[in-house]
Amino acid sequence: MTAILAKNEASSLWARFCEWITSTENRLYIGWFGVIMIPTLLTATSVFIIAFIAAPPVDIDGIREPVSGSLLYGNNIISGAVVPTSNAIGLHFYPIWEAASLDEWLYNGGPYQLIVCHFFLGICCYMGREWELSYRLGMRPWIAVAYSAPVAAATAVFIIYPIGQGSFSDGMPLGISGTFNFMIVFQAEHNILMHPFHMLGVAGVFGGSLFSAMHGSLVTSSLIRETTENESANEGYKFGQEEETYNIVAAHGYFGRLIFQYASFNNSRSLHFFLAAWPVVGIWFTALGISTMAFNLNGFNFNQSVVDSQGRVLNTWADIINRANLGMEVMHERNAHNFPLDLASVEAPSVNA
């Protein structure tokens, strides 16, 4: 009898725990994805803060020339970063217990891999948690679908690109100037500005900003007056009210006359779907572009200059881009190799002639 009561009590405790985890009445929804998300994101955030402040220099290129990234080693908020794991480690899984000592782990940039792996798990679980909460509330799943765009982008620069290039040292540094350095080197090595998927991503981001500003300004300009001149227009809206707070017909008429009739949406649902889908699809394409360039399927190149009938080069914008790319590549890892790969791969002339 005692065993049965103990079993029922344990079962009841587990049932209460499950109910609490999946309850939509909590101030913050946890969910089963949250059980993984919370510790992974807390770990990534804690290690990032500690490493950004106090991590020792990292031998990023694997040539015994450490690069400092933390505040205590001479950097500021702009120049500071968590430096990627050493090229000497490559793609090997490098937890603390794989290193001979903590000093070796820090010297080889172990914190970067720890942060990136936990961050990746955390944001994936955050996306799953969005879907889980939507499911339990009876909502459609598009919030998680929209969030998949930044998840795909982060996965591309932190996971797929290092895999394609053969080393976590090629991942994006975790800092402001490190991000810009990553972008410049990416352009030098892959000519990303001439990749169609990057162009679609630019159209998605800037187009999304434009459409968001247009929508917000149209709605704000066509609010239904509910207040006096001495009150804020925001006081005219009560949370949960059934009435429309703006006149979509007026906004539609204004924009249709400003551009042309069919440039304006007359359906609020299709309008908001478009506002969500445009930047999401653009960022999906950018992430796909990064993922293909990770394996050196690069942007268009025009390495063969345009020449006239006499063989003289006719300088074009492509020549300027090529020179800029070579210049950026020369500055990158200047102590690891003497020339950019484009120049080093040229066959040397014979000296026996």
Curated annotation (Swiss-Prot):
HAMAP family: PSII_PsbA_D1
Pfam families xref list: Photo_RC (PF00124)
Family classification: Belongs to the reaction center PufL/M/PsbA/D family.
Gene Ontology BP, a term: response to herbicide
GO MF, any single term: oxygen evolving activity
Gene (name only): psbA
Protein name: Photosystem II protein D1
Record: residues binding [CaMn4O5] cluster: 170, 189, 332-333, 342, 344
Alphabetical list of PANTHER family matching this protein: PHOTOSYSTEM II D2 PROTEIN, PHOTOSYSTEM II PROTEIN D1
